[in-house]
Amino acid sequence: VIRELIEANESETDASIVILAEDDKEKMDNIIRDNISYFATTRVITRSGVVTNINNLKKVMAENAKSVIIMNSAASWRPESEKTLADALVLKSIMSIIAVCNGDEHPPIVCEIHSDRDRDLAENISNGEVKALNEVSVLSRMIAQLALSRNGLSIVYSDMVGFDGNEFYFYRPDDGWGGNLTFGDSINRFKSSTPMGVHNSKGDIILNPSKEMPIESEDELIIFAEDDSTIFYFEKPVFEPSTSEIPTSIVEPKSHRIALLNWTTKTAIILEKLCSYLPKGSELCVFVSSKLPEMDSSKTTLAEGYPDIEISMNEMDLNDLQSLNEMEPQNFDSILILSPGGTTIEEMDAYVISLLIRIRQILIKNSGAKSGSESRAWPKLITEVMDSENIDIILNSGVEDFMVSNQFVSQIMAQVSEEPMALDVYDDLFQAEGSELYIKPASYYFDFKDAETITVPYGECVQAAKLRNEVILGLQIHADQKSKNDMFGIVLIPDKDEEFTLSLEDGLIALAEDET
């Protein structure tokens, strides 16, 4: 969180982050010094004390803060009793900040709360702005989307939630929109940033609205951009596209067969989200070392709500190579490996990596290929990573998409502290209703005829997506998919005049209603 806020404050001449915690001050200072080497214009000040003590909050002048971030002391994999106590402490901390402000308007507060009930309570506790993040809910919905899109979507999300990449901003020109502007028109009024949706005067967030939707004078556009300083609105179109038609072949949603390994606090939510996205005829198979009572009740509930999707709960020794082989991993479209929890982050990642190695060994043996690109029998492997230092090991295990869980949550919290409405955008983005992010084949947008490649300006890609009632945020270049230095082939919001040579294997990153 500190690292993200330092990045966000780079345009400030003198910024400060004040940390109040019960830890020893010297210990906190050492941890910060050991892990962060670049502070730019930001001063980091630590103070040891009880976070709910009003005198301590007055000493750090909490009432004058630009925003307040309240960290939850219990990790999502800890026992329920521990999480309940930690949530109560967060609620008490919110009340203490309100008290410091004497009931007047307080700074925006962003906090992490495990219980949905307590989350609702936190957000309605005062007249001020309180945004409560449920780590399990956010990550579960994100993981479910990774299973349904082409490889690389996690890289897009990583870029979106971090201040060192691209973010979304709420933008309205000082002198207004100039009248008679539709959302479709607005897309070509920005050169190297892209409108994703509208924040209207009623407070509604609408992602990928109808291209005919008029932009009212008080509306803000939700702009995906590298920085707010790079957002420039032009009164006239910056690009005149020539694309007037797109391929007309109808793409039907295809059924998926997805395996989920381990039952965690996220599994039930991931299952529910997958059911809400998947077409009929799809199959979801959960594999665990030891079945839990809630698994069958979850299956029963989902079967009633989604009778056209087959759901199974299977018990097997996930540490045994023979048992994993009987699972026939090569016959799944996607395999989600969830981190079951543990004493330390290193222990949790070690478990996931060892399981990945076993699955990879089976896939190589059964498909006769060394990587997924060499065989159609190689499913998409998706996993959680707790420590970003382990990413390279994970990638060498054959993983196509990964999520650094702790990092994602920290980055979102930092982003919401800078722009509270960002959480509303994420909530909308991760719902089955409306539009979500997908990476779709270039052939959905352009007719290649008999050509292996076509060369087009990025603005034509934007226009082709517009004709499909979509918004695109960038491209995926297949040739660079294995290159970490090239963001695994992901190119986000290039200039509309920049030309790209696209092949049938390349993709467009689209904000769309479904995967077709």
Annotate each language-model stretch with its function.
Residues 1-516:
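Cytosolic regulatory regions of ion transport systems
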